[in-house]
Amino acid sequence: MKKRDDVNKILIIGSGPIIIGQACEFDYSGTQACKALKKLGYEIVLVNSNPATIMTDPTTADVTYIEPLNADRITQIIEKERPDGLLPNLGGQTGLNLCAELYRKGVLDKYGVKVIGVQVDAIERGEDRIEFKNLMNSLGIEMARSEVAYSVDEALEIADRLGYPVVLRPAYTMGGAGGGLVYNVEELKTVCERGLQASLVGQVLVEESVLGWEELELEVVRDSTGKMITVCFIENIDPLGVHTGDSFCSAPMLTIPEDVQEELQRQAYRIVDAIEVIGGTNVQFARNTDDGRIIVIEINPRTSRSSALASKATGFPIALVSAMLAAGLDLCDIPCGKYGTLDKYIPDGDYVVIKFARWAFEKFKGSQDKLGTQMRAVGEVMSIGKTYKEAFQKAIRSLEIGRYGLGGAKNYAELPLKELLNMLHTPSSERQFIMYEAIRKGADIDELYDITKIKPYFLKEMKELVEEEEELKKYNGSVPPTDVLEKAKKDGFADKYLSQLLGVPEEDIRHARIEAGIVEAWEGVHVSGTQDSAYYYSSYNMKDESVASDKRKIMILGGGPNRIGQGIEFDYCCVHAAMALKKLGFETIIVNCNPETVSTDYDTSDKLYFEPLTLEDVLSIHEKEKPLGVIAQFGGQTPLNLAADLKKNGVNILGTTPETIDMAEDRDLFRAMMDKLGIPMPESGMAVTVDDALAIAKKIGYPLMVRPSYVLGGRGMEVVHDDEHMRVYMAAAVGVTPDRPILIDRFLNNALECEADAISDGENVFVPAVMEHIELAGIHSGDSACVLPSKNISDKNVEIIKDYTRRIAKEMNVKGLMNMQYAIENDTVYVLEANPRASRTVPLVSKVCNIGMVPLATQIITMPITGNPSPVPELKEKKFNHCGVKEAVLPFNMFQEVDPLLGPEMRSTGEVLGMASDFGEAFFKAEEATQTALPLEGTVLISVNDRDKSELIEVAEGFHECGFNIIATGGTCDMINGAGIPATKIFKLQQGRPNV
């Protein structure tokens, strides 16, 4: 069948900011869809509110809108652009919900917009709990016993009938938002109320608990003729009860019999056919291992987190193919390597893929490390190996949590077996590590299965690793014999982990291993729907058959798993670097292990290595490919932490040197440089012990900002107000050494914070704009809203900031990107820190200032190889007629037990951008894009300190004119009334009633 000609202009709705449950996999799917549809000759209109995405780049679609994702804004875009098609199933839950809302409001009919890929009634059949249940009943496919509730009272009645525990699932949500497993009446009341609010239609499904059953997923693709293929079978290793986004899983299924897989496929095909999705669908099943009963849990009639994983696990680009099918092509029209065409595809890889989630409980004080039906993970890694053991151990070292194997985590080795078994009763992010120590202490496989419901196959594999580790320890203090070392490497033991186990330097193990000929081999995963594209994984269990070209090559190190402080912004930088290198005539190599990203898409680089970002893995790729150099400054802290060791091993680090990066982190060296340049910094000191810290505090005076060195996202940062607080902080600080001391700075209490990104060639430096933080000093820059260009910084101070930035970049010989953080107190500009690397604001500055920050930096970084002149002298400052406001998106809805106060430790998962011709509208749009509706009526509480009272009247007058009632405290109220503005006085808590 040929492509559709009844649509010419297609609107694609993005998924908005990165939140728990909806991350950069939708940037990956949206970018792929744009590529596919443009290639087929369609005009693309794209709308998304997230500036850190590749899909919102001006070159991805024909017309791009960075606007809030709600029905009103999209209606305005439809009215202006007049698309005749809408593709809703690539923008996650956000895209589907908006499509359904636009349909219900009659907008799509009014403007003649056809929905392609998935019909609106199909969305309702898949997403509406009642519709889905009725459809399953008509097909004779079993579901968990359940009933729908529209109120808490109804839910209580249903739970009584079904028996506790029950699962609550709100309709039209994702990431398990608002839902959960409840064991009693009180829990049900709390969770149900939350669920009814979270649901788009005020509907919650109350379902019998299938806790402990197997959770199995299929990714199915269907075309308009009804032809279906299964892309991937995914086995969740954690049982039901843990959200699939938090669950540890494998592809292919490792313990599920062939006949059961066939039955799952038969049922999945009947469901997908009945819902009539064109493109990818994720179908989730539960199976009771006692009696073999299979039930369907739910489907996602769209690309999802699982489809991104399935795509990367199999080499089948689901989003790309889904877009082509939505445009009218059929599976038999799309060529596919060895199968001929896609309709003949079967998943037949001879390797094992493991997905492991990355959590951020340490960022949320008071959060419970407990996994349930509500997703808590902020990122994930994927690893590929020839065996389960190899892939599993690769996944652990990919996580970047300071662990290179399963043993030695926290203090688990010191705990008695009974305590470890107790800890396993509640699933947590530490579950695999606790099990490992429990097995070491003699836990029985059957007992572990009864507690965790993790199948004996996986527990036995873990037991074999424990036994092998105990065997290895016999060689303590030396490199083991070749046969023992070879077996350890085949089972996935990392060089670094062996070094920790044996007390031998990692270097010695690496040299002995290479000398004995124990080296990684590489194999390609073919990409379906392409002629000869592939990406590569390593294994010690095969012969090397991959071929490295002799072209001029440059390697980019990616950012690894998403986490708070290091997310999609750094992937954006890596992708742009790859594009720029291709234009400069280099073959590009990317190393990364994050399945959600555009950087791990098969055609972003010339060669993709899906590998952990560790010294061992990067060095072996370097040895294989022999690139001219490696770029470490675009992937956040991950590659920077490797840079010095790579350089020691003869790797040419391009751009800013590891020594410069270390100097920026070393407070003494950096302060000496600022003194030399005559640039003010807040007084500071470095402490290794409590006594050091108290002595510094006495000298500088409280409040103080304290933090560890070498961290990203403000990990471990706090504002300390007294000696007692300082003692508590120092006692809790982990891994503090003279090399890595605690940094202590005077906290600039009433300062305005701002930052500047710069492009430098070591001599010439360009600063596109200064960003002003809207939140007060002390809130991490990643959590603060910011405005670009600045609004309240005097021209004089903007010039000072640009001058300081230029002088510092030149002095440090920065080659590439740099980010500078400043604070202005009493009209003095203080330098807070310098980051000689890409920062999370690079996509924001690139978009608002319309400047290709990363391509320019890439040109500079490669100048020694290309001999090209620097682009920096040609860059000119531009005047803006518009204003951009970035607002942070925070995940407190997923951490109900945490106090939602912001501080110097970053907690946001994503961001949105509001753009307009003036600050007010841009700020309004940014707030609107975070799904926080700004109130247009009601009562405003005003209470300000004396210093700010002079600016108060104008603000109060504005609120009064807008029709708001004003209540105010003491002196503030008198001042407002004195200006002729009505206000009601209210007391502070300690002053009496009525109070705040």
Annotate each predicted stretch with a short phrase.
Residues 2, 27, 32, 39, ...:
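ATP-dependent carboxylate activation and anion-phosphoryl transfer catalytic cores
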Residues 157-167, 695-705:
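Acidic/histidine-enriched active-site and ligand-binding environments that engage anionic O-linkages
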Residues 452-459, 500-511:
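Short, basic interhelical loop/turn and adjoining N-cap
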Residues 17-20, 121-123, 142, 172-175, ...:
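A short, flexible beta-alpha/helix-coil linker loop
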Residues 1-141, 150-157, 394, 447, ...:
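ATP-binding N-terminal substructure of ATP-dependent carboxylate-amine bond-forming enzymes
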